[in-house]
Amino acid sequence: MNINIRSNPMRKWFIWAIVLIGCLPINKALAQQSGDAERNTLRIMSYNIRNGRGMDEVTDLGRIAEAIRKVAPDVVAVQEVDSVTGRSGGIDVLRTLGERTLMFPTYAPAIDFDGGKYGVGMLSKEKPVSYRYIALPGREEERVLLWVEFERYIFCCTHLSLTPEDRMLSLPILRREAASAHKPLFIAGDWNATAHSPFITEISKDFLLLSNPKQATFPASTPDSCLDYIAGYVKNGQPFTRLSAWVPEEAVASDHRPVVTEVRLKAKPEEIFYAAPYLQNPTEGGITVMWQTHVPTYSWVEYGTDTLNLKKARTIVDGQVICNGLHNKIRLTDLRPGQTYYYRVCSREIMLYQAYKKEFGETAVSPFYTFTLPSASQKDFTALIFNDLHKHIPTLDALYGQVRDIPYDFVVFNGDCIDDPANEKEALYLSLIHI
């Protein structure tokens, strides 16, 4: 029973960890899958807070913080923010909001004002990698663009001029900065431009509006105009998909309502696979190929007796391909005993899966592996059996060192290799350790 993958030692594909997924309680497994499926999803918010002064002329940062907490964004672009001014009683407004929302504050002053500064800011769940700010035109008031880099994306915040000419003069600067980005870039803020204005028409040539311009944001009590926007840079391709957009019904805390959008960032091909594929159930002229991905995918197996003439296998139930999940299980059938087969697995990310709209990302393709089903005359085989590892890597290292050079047909990881896994990530724990 020769079931081997291409020069891939046993300890580089810990199938025992993955097999334990089946032992998880269903609700825990589903909850964990949902969490992993959303790992690339980003909730973006933009809010002109008028320094916390509401439609009732009461300044209350608690209301602003509560409006943000209700949305639970990953990142917020904030406009009209005081920093230790007399008007704000010497308070660092953005830092105060950061403390109340448990988010990192990043500030960009636009002007000196009342003994302190006045400008824009950003709140983020993730600590920024770097930030800078760039001056923008504004004849009635100086303007600024706040550029903040995170691990996977760049987010910019600005409050554009009331003057149409200055807004148009800002466009080349916005385009220049966006073109220099080496990650997906988003920009948000109060742009002081209505949905059908020349500025929105022009910026839409390079940026995709992610918020809904048909939903009014100003004035907050009875909004009749959209002045607040979130957009993504798409001139060099679209590395994300918009999932949803809305305007929360916050009518009092500020004179603007916030805008919110959710996007999913595309995974790079090398980020799609969780670990190498593994084989199960080599019976009745067939074998099952299984593997996991970090993101929802449409997946298939390509296989054949050589690497040039390949068949494609998928899992089909009632005429429909099973997809849009993280766990892939595909059965190869009509195989000949004693014949060596080559195979590789392919997974294409599903960015959006709706009844009438589907969007796809990149495709990951594994190297070729091989397996040979046992022939009818084969009676002998070699198996490696491990017990009671208790997630102890040094023990696995030592045991593997004793059998490193033994050609084996399959591996059995018996009881207590992982102690009572609480969730899927724990069950998959060792499959990521490439010792």
Role assignments for model-derived ranges:
Residues 29-100, 112-113, 264-270, 275, ...:
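N-terminal, active-site-proximal structural segment of metallo-dependent hydrolase catalytic domains
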Residues 32-34, 133-134, 166-168, 176-186, ...:
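Metal-dependent phosphoester-hydrolase catalytic domains
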Residues 33-59, 67, 283-286, 294-300, ...:
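N-terminal active-site segment of His-dependent metallophosphoesterases
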Residues 42-49, 64-88, 155-158, 174-201, ...:
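Active-site beta-strand/loop signature of hydrolases that rely on acidic residues for catalysis
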Residues 56-57, 81-154, 246-247, 322:
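Structured beta-strand-rich core segments of catalytic domains in phosphoester-bond hydrolases
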Residues 291, 301, 338-347:
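Short beta-strand segments enriched for Tyr within beta-sheet-rich domains
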Residues 332-337:
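Short, flexible loop/turn segments at beta-strand junctions in immunoglobulin-like
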Residues 433-435:
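Conserved small/polar residues in nucleotide/adenosyl-binding loops
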